[in-house]
Amino acid sequence: MTCKIIGSGGYLPPKIISNDELTKFVDTNDKWIRTRTGILQRHIAGDAEYTSHLAFKSAQKAIEDAMISVDDIDLIIICTTTPDNSFPSVATKLHGYLGLTNIPSFDLQAVCAGFIYGLQLAHSLIVSGKYKTILLIGAEKMTSLLDWNDRSTCVLFGDGAGSVILQRSNDDSGLIDSNIFSSGTDYEILYTSGGTSMNGTSGKIVMQGQKLFRHAIEKMLQSIEDLLYANQFSVSDIDYFIPHQANIRIINKLAELLNIEEHKVVKTVEKHANCSAASIPLALSALKESGKIKKGDILLFSAIGAGLTWGGALIRW
């Protein structure tokens, strides 16, 4: 028994900042950004547009795509690093926006690996029989954590949200397997300079880029190889590889090491930048909207985030 995605939806704020526009207030240039990251632009939420608003708009699309009633949802999980408030959770605010009553809702924080963590948790809860229809969302306003004077980080991130509706599968489609990991000894590679119990502020993103690149390749590769081996899959069985959209160099290097054909690799980092927990569901939504994906296709997800946290998932569409 497993669970499957019956609907998906993505939302990106309408405001776009190109690399050229960044050069007006950051010491950088388009070539430098493109060469190192593959990013051409990023979507930026407005001052009065919060993570809960992004989540709501993507949730509406996923509910419509799944062709269900909002009242069919019996659990909400939002994966986010950028909540509107320290409390209550973004999920409970969304609960109110959707007009729901009494069903549980909570946030999950595993940074860029959040969607993989959330997917494994949602799967377990559905398979247990406790819940039938789960709304799982990755939603981030990453620009709220940026130091716009730090060109090594401010060029990398964008805002957005991606949602999926999960239900029990009655056939061979759905989540085949997933794995998640963490390594707390590596937290100083990527973190924020603040927190509510530390100094009462959210802080700004601090990153050791070269170390993170090495860890990303090593850990994502091992996670993927473990998944394939455990489920007797080969790389040639994969129809679409949807990695976390952090950096084009990481994506390309993984594809090279795994020997995955170029047309199978889903890349949205060019236009979305790094949307943290939202990046995989946003990329999935874009792939689905393209009309390329078909029933029976095998999808491979892979992500790594601060913590460090990482993991992967195999899905039969």
Curated annotation (Swiss-Prot):
Residue span of region ACP-binding:
245-249
Question: Could you tell me the keywords of this UniProt record?
Answer: Acyltransferase, Cytoplasm, Fatty acid biosynthesis, Fatty acid metabolism, Lipid biosynthesis, Lipid metabolism, Multifunctional enzyme, Transferase
Q: Which residue ranges run through the membrane?
A: none
Q: Name one GO cellular component term.
A: cytoplasm
Pathway annotation: Lipid metabolism; fatty acid biosynthesis
Pfam family of the protein (one): ACP_syn_III_C
| GO function terms (MF aspect) | 3-oxoacyl-[acyl-carrier-protein] synthase activity; beta-ketoacyl-acyl-carrier-protein synthase III activity
Xref: Gene3D superfamilies:
3.40.47.10
Q: What class of enzyme is it?
A: transferase
EC number per UniProt = 2.3.1.180
Extract one GO BP annotation from the record.
secondary metabolite biosynthetic process
**Any idea where this protein resides?**
Cytoplasm
Q: Provide the reaction this enzyme catalyses.
A: malonyl-[ACP] + acetyl-CoA + H(+) = 3-oxobutanoyl-[ACP] + CO2 + CoA
Q: Which CDD domains does the record cross-reference, listed alphabetically?
A: KAS_III
Which Cys residues form disulphide pairs? none
Q: Where is this protein primarily located?
A: cytoplasm
Q: Which residues form the active site?
A: C112, H244, N274
- InterPro entries this protein is in? ACP_syn_III_C (IPR013747), ACP_syn_III_N (IPR013751), FabH (IPR004655), Thiolase-like (IPR016039)
Question: Which SUPFAM superfamilies does the protein's record reference?
Answer: Thiolase-like
Q: Which PANTHER family match?
A: 3-OXOACYL-[ACYL-CARRIER-PROTEIN] SYNTHASE 3 (PTHR34069), BETA-KETOACYL-[ACYL-CARRIER-PROTEIN] SYNTHASE III (PTHR34069:SF2)
Q: What does this protein do?
A: Catalyzes the condensation reaction of fatty acid synthesis by the addition to an acyl acceptor of two carbons from malonyl-ACP. Catalyzes the first condensation reaction which initiates fatty acid synthesis and may therefore play a role in governing the total rate of fatty acid production. Possesses both acetoacetyl-ACP synthase and acetyl transacylase activities. Its substrate specificity determines the biosynthesis of branched-chain and/or straight-chain of fatty acids.
> Subunit structure, briefly?
Homodimer.
**UniProt comment concerning the protein's domains:** The last Arg residue of the ACP-binding site is essential for the weak association between ACP/AcpP and FabH.
Q: Which family does the similarity line name?
A: Belongs to the thiolase-like superfamily. FabH family.
Name this protein carries in UniProt? Beta-ketoacyl-[acyl-carrier-protein] synthase III
- The gene name on file is fabH
